[in-house]
Amino acid sequence: MKLIKNLMPLKSAEKIVFEKLSEYLDENKKVKEVDIVEALNRISAEDIKAPIDLPYFNKAAMDGYAVIAEDTFGASETNPIILNLADGDEITYGEAKKIFTGDKLPKNANAVVMKEFCNEVDDFVEVYKTVHPNENVSRIGEDVKKGDVVLKKGEIINPYHLNMLASLGIKKIKVYDLSFGIISTGDELINLDEIRDIEEDISKLDGKIINSNSYMLYGLVKNLGFNAKIYDIVKDDKEKLKKAIKTALSENDALLITGGTSVSERDITVETVRELGDVIVHGVNIRPGKPFGFGIINDKPVFMLSGYPVASAVQFELFIQRFFIERKKVTLPLKRNMASELGRVDFVRVKVDIEVEPIRITGSGVISSLIKSDGYILIPENVEGYEKGELVDVYLLK
């Protein structure tokens, strides 16, 4: 059995891939300015800073009466303070103005007495509770101060971001705008639409594998807010693969090829890419996902991913997802011992609770482990594992 020699350290491979991706995005201006409603679920290509304070005026946080707090000092149920009702944009000492949640405070007002502690009679109001300055008031800049970063470059834009952006008067933002072609290779693959009834057709498959990787990769790309197109399966034929690669790259910004990345006679992907362009990375010291490849054809990035689902998902996470998005990280104790082998980085799928538990299922193709995992741990190449109770960094997937 042939082995990939001279495996590249993960950090070195990531650095190379990320630098090439950055160059491609910068040189080809793969950034698009869109209306904020079109930005939902896409990746921000810039830091957005608040152009104003939010709120930009002092406003009532409760229904009640806007007052000058000092007027209420000493007020109680047995000793109410009586204030005259005002009806303008300004109050003076001895006055109060009826106000509703979200209303702008009148000039000079610095507190709100909740309506439950007031009794309005004719043109005055009895106040039964002392309030302090800024009580029941949302102050200028309390939510966001001018200059605060409200959306970071690399964040996926969610509905709450849209609320914030609209509140700040921001109508358009820049997002990454990319399209990925997806090609699956291998004589052993068949298309999903060739299956009428899996229970009836299972005996006819004769060891064939349904092309499921394309659907997973399609979903991963779409989750980043990018466009994706699945191409027909390409058998283990170099000329047919060349033709498919040329077509996909003519229609997309980048290409994902899954399968054929190892070094057996049937693994033709890396050699084919090399004949069409440059292979910059092939073989990384990670498990699963060792036979990862990255190349450039006609100045466009080509990712060569494993045919095994878990390995392919890991490679996508490490070399594409992590370039665009910074995963949230938590530190938690391990529920049980976790072994590793020196000289490689182990990507361990885990379940996350008050402790983190490695998923026992192993292998590069075990699909269920992807569904069950909430996050992952990266065990460095110089660590032989972790012991139960040891604190570890967990990257969250959900």
UniProtKB/Swiss-Prot annotation:
Cellular compartments per GO CC: cytoplasm
Keyword terms, alphabetized: Molybdenum cofactor biosynthesis
Gene Ontology terms for molecular function: molybdopterin molybdotransferase activity
Pathway: Cofactor biosynthesis; molybdopterin biosynthesis
Transmembrane residue ranges: none
SUPFAM superfamilies per UniProt: MoeA C-terminal domain-like, MoeA N-terminal region -like, Molybdenum cofactor biosynthesis proteins
One GO biological process term: Mo-molybdopterin cofactor biosynthetic process
InterPro entries: MoaB/Mog-like_dom_sf (IPR036425), MoaB/Mog_dom (IPR001453), MoCF_biosynth_CS (IPR008284), MoeA-like (IPR038987), MoeA_C_domain_IV (IPR005111), MoeA_C_domain_IV_sf (IPR036688), MoeA_linker/N (IPR005110), MoeA_linker/N_sf (IPR036135)
The organism's place on the tree of life at top rank: Archaea
CDD domains per UniProt: MoeA
Classification via PROSITE patterns: MOCF_BIOSYNTHESIS_2
Family: Belongs to the MoeA family.
Protein name: Putative molybdopterin biosynthesis protein MJ0666
